[in-house]
């Protein structure tokens, strides 16, 4: 779709599940999006960094969302590897 200036714009950009790489549809009301922020260990305040994970409803229905979040957090270095 084009706007008045002739630039291509998207009306809807679908999210993808971080665990299974499936597209999260607009009607998937069981899906969740978690944002984990970096915290300064001395002050306990939020820094500028953050990581966002989107989990689709199918993963949550199977009861695998906690394992998927731990796996993704280990891969990104948020949780230690021997957790």
UniProtKB/Swiss-Prot annotation:
Its main location: cytoplasm. Pfam families: Ribosomal_S21e. GO terms for molecular function: ribosome binding; structural constituent of ribosome. The keyword Disulfide bond does not apply. It is found in: Cytoplasm, Cytosol; Cytoplasm; Rough endoplasmic reticulum. Keywords: Cytoplasm, Developmental protein, Endoplasmic reticulum, Ribonucleoprotein, Ribosomal protein, rRNA processing, Translation regulation. Component of the 40S small ribosomal subunit. Interacts with sta. May be an associated component of the ribosome rather than a core structural subunit. May act as a translation initiation factor. Has a role in regulation of cell proliferation in the hematopoietic organs and the imaginal disks of larva. Belongs to the eukaryotic ribosomal protein eS21 family. This is Small ribosomal subunit protein eS21. It comes from Drosophila simulans (Fruit fly).
């Amino acid at each position: 779709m084009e706007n008045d200036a002739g630039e291509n714009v998207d009306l809807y950009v679908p999210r993808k599940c971080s665990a299974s790489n499936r597209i999260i549809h607009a009607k998937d009301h069981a899906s969740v999006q978690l944002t984990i922020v970096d915290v300064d260990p001395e002050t306990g305040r939020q820094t500028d960094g953050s990581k966002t994970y989107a989990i689709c409803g199918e993963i949550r229905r199977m009861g695998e969302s906690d394992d998927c979040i731990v796996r993704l957090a280990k891969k990104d270095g948020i949780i230690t590897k021997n957790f």
